[in-house]
Amino acid sequence: ACLPQSMTGSAAVLERFWAMDTSMTLDAVIEHWWRCSTRDMHRSYVDDATLALLEHLTSSAQLVFTSVCDAISSKVPKNRSGRVSTSILSEPVLFRLLELYATKLDAGSIAQVWPIMSLLARTMAQTTSPYVVYHALRLTTVMGTKLTDSNLFNEQRTRRDVQDAFVRLCELTISLYGRSLDISSGRDSDAPSVASDRGETPSDVVSPTSVVQTLCSMVLPAFTTLRVDQDKIQSVSASLAYYILAPGFRARQGSWEPEPLLFEVLESLTQLPATSKTWRSYVLDTFFDVRFFAQSLDMGKQWAPMIAALFRSERDRLSDVIGRISTASSNLFTSRDSDLFARVGAIRRLSYVVYTSETNAFLAQLPLIQEKVVDILRSSPADLVHAEVYLCMRVFLCRFASQHLTGFWPIILTEMVRILAQAKVDLPADKSDRLQLVFSVVKLADFLI
């Protein structure tokens, strides 16, 4: 029989055991919970039953936290050469129970047990065991984010205590896992080496992939929730860029497209304030690569929020995008086709940046954009370049209010009428560049109607 049945028939006996030896009884309850949860059972039912039993045996959440935290502190070695525990109740199991318990508590209860957690966090910050620090970071993140809903977090001393514990554990996790966080190889071969000095069991070892996923989904968003200082955010961002982004982007020579988890890291970093210096080079190098628009539609959608974040934080960079648009060939050493596609790509980059932005985000640069569009149309461009201008105008109609685009219409409408009139007299051949131009004009006309 598993936990629910044991609770029904043995509550009185457990209460007597709890009174005689709290520590051993707690170990037995947690061990029973862990064995049941690892079997093919209803996990949520087992979790709820365990927490209900603990609440029945104890008078407060503080007692549960104190007992489990004491058990963790007694097991955690101060260095990698510490004694290996042979009990099933390893530190990860105890941390998982506390994390489960913390998710069920409200902000008021979290405020009551935070002093206990604060003491545990300081103890964990002195160990060099990667998986212990990792689980301590997860628990601190869960409790810290919940604590923001309580009045206690508004007190400067408590807020600083939460922030310091959170940042310290985050930095320690990154430094202890170090280069094993490189996910570019697509395997977790480094995970055993991280823990080999202590000989942890497979259930104790946390793979670098799991660490990176936790950093993206839980830890990085918490920097904003916990109102961490920008200099500390920048420091953590720089570390993640060094250990994850740099090797990941260097290793994409085969398929060129970054791995999905690398995208997740980059997108998470772009959502943090004042961190663009740590990740902008990876975004810009990809964006200005000639292969950028050869990607799939899904990849283009994934890059959109990152491009938007970069140009939102550094709006002056749009001038660089506009400046790369040439009205005529200026390089004698490139082929006609290469020059043509380079000019088309430059215009499309402008369209892409504007499309990923918010409405009227680049009003200050609109006169410069208008000047460039007029110069292109007056230079009698190739049909593909000409067609790209009308795609760009459709994007402008989506991202600028109509009153800001009045300066474009005299030359745009004149060219559209001319092209349609010419097509009526001389129908373009199938699959020709001229047909592509007519199609682009027709789509803009349809959009205007």
PLM segments and residue spans:
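Alpha-helical solenoid cores of large eukaryotic proteins
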Residues: 1-108, 115-153, 157-360, 367-383, ...
